[in-house]
């Protein structure tokens, strides 16, 4: 880690020619100055203190019933927990592949480093409310996720066929998911514990993953994949 919670390779939003905000990547930090590169090839610099990555978490959920005041879900419960600890959850309930692609794109362009997927899963698929999405389709919808950590509570997606393909295809910094079937109650518990370690204790995603796995080895059986 360099700077104040900034990493080389972080995706940030930075002004260019004082006109607009453009997505950029930190390339080097020195003497309190951040150097960054835009997608169109332009480069710029500015004080690192103006380029703080957000504590946003993109929460994308798809279950059989849309959460309400009387019906709670893992994703909605996680969102309330994140607010309690000072993070900024961006919750979206989806039903279709098209909606999944839309919100993955928003997450990809965001300064957020974290994406959370709350839905059913199979060996090589995410199961949405109205359709199933194969891992290859998920990769195509997600695009370039370098600099992002993706936590999935979807059953069975922590197997090699899904996890290794996902990080290889998207370039995500990490993909964390249960290898076996997991109850929603356990999914809610381990996801909250993971983000508590991440945001409150300031540890890395891998350290948070190891902590959760050691605490609940049988209930979660989480796997950690990286490129």
Model-derived features with residue positions:
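Active-site proximal helix-loop segment of RNase H-like, two-metal nucleases, encompassing DDE(D)
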Residues: 189-202
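Basic/aromatic-rich interaction segments and small domains that mediate binding to polyanionic partners
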Residues: 11, 15-47
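Mixed-charge, Lys/Arg-rich low-complexity intrinsically disordered regions
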Residues: 1-8
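Caspase-like cysteine protease fold
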Residues: 53, 57, 131-142, 200-227
């Amino acid at each position: 880690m360099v700077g104040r919670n900034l990493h080389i390779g972080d995706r940030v939003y930075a002004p260019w020619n004082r006109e607009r905000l453009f997505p950029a990547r930190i390339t080097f930090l020195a003497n309190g100055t951040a150097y960054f590169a835009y997608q169109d090839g332009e480069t710029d610099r500015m004080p690192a203190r103006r380029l703080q990555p957000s504590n946003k978490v993109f929460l994308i959920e798809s279950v059989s019933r849309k959460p309400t005041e009387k019906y709670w879900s893992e994703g909605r419960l996680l969102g309330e927990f994140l607010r309690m600890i000072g993070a900024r959850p961006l919750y979206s309930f989806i039903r279709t592949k098209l909606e999944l692609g839309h919100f993955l794109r928003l997450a990809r362009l965001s300064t957020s480093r974290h994406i959370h997927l709350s839905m059913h899963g199979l060996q090589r698929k995410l199961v949405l409310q109205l359709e199933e999405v194969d891992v290859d389709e998920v990769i195509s919808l997600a695009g370039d996720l370098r600099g992002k950590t993706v936590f999935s509570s979807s059953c069975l997606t922590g197997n090699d066929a899904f996890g290794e393909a996902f990080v290889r295809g998207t370039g995500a910094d990490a993909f964390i998911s249960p290898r076996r079937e997991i109850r929603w109650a356990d999914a809610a518990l381990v996801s909250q514990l993971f983000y508590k370690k991440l945001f409150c204790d300031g540890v890395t995603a891998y350290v948070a993953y190891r902590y959760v796995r050691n605490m609940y080895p049988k209930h979660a059986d989480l796997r950690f994949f990286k490129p």
